[in-house]
Amino acid sequence: AVTAYRGHIYGITVKTFLPNYNEFYEKRWFSSARELSTDHIYASELLGSEECDYAIPLGNNLIYHLPDAFCFGAEICEDLWAPIPPSAFMAMSGAELILNLSASNDTIGKREYREKLVKEKSTSLMCTYLYASAGANESTTDLIFSGHCMICEGGKMLAENSRIAENNYLLVADIDIERIQADRLKGKTYQDCAGTYGSAVSMRQILIPVSEAFESDGSLRSVNPHPFTPGDTKRRQKRCMDIFHMQIGGLAKRLSICGGKMVIGVSGGMDSTLSLLWLHRP
């Protein structure tokens, strides 16, 4: 994954975990980032030109800083599927955005599994996870690709493409960076984990001098006017029953401690009516 801005390459992120099972046999041709013998490559070697030569950071431990905006890191395809992915150390070192450049083929049920992976990762790392996979034009006689792309923040899917992407397209969404930062400040367990394991991998911080402002009017982000009430009837009924049974459990525990019988004066108001329903419910 090459990170470039205005003709300058700021870093190259290398894949760490190579799949070598089922239809994949990447270790036949490629090596892991763990086997790198250098932490940089010169632009002249990469571009074949001596006109502008400089050292480009190379590895799986790069975090990019955009002044007064956000930090991001990148990982490649199979890295997401690992028990401890490179993105875990990137997030604990400050990256609010994780980008995944992937070539994940389609099989029965795999799309749904990828969705669960990305949602879970954006939840546990308290980040926004941007996932982009190879499109339909990359399909061969052996593998089918659909161009599956997702933008997920804190376990919530902000944007996702249709089933098969045959043409080039952009997937966009408004991301709440300040919410991510606030959640991390509030989440003491996250801070403890970062303090314990964040230094396990030495991350390299790279500044990208971007002058453009990253602002939005929020029109690309849908806001649910009823965040605690599911729109789907079945889910709403389940939510209400969950609340109802929690209240029953709390009242039953209190009565078991106090002993004796329950006496309710039913006035017709909400409190006494609900109390009567809680007691009547087996």
PLM regions with names:
Residues 1-265, 273-282:
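Enzyme catalytic cores with a strong preference for nitrogen-chemistry domains
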Residues 269:
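Conserved G/P- and acidic residue-centered "switch" motifs that form tight phosphate/ATP-binding loops
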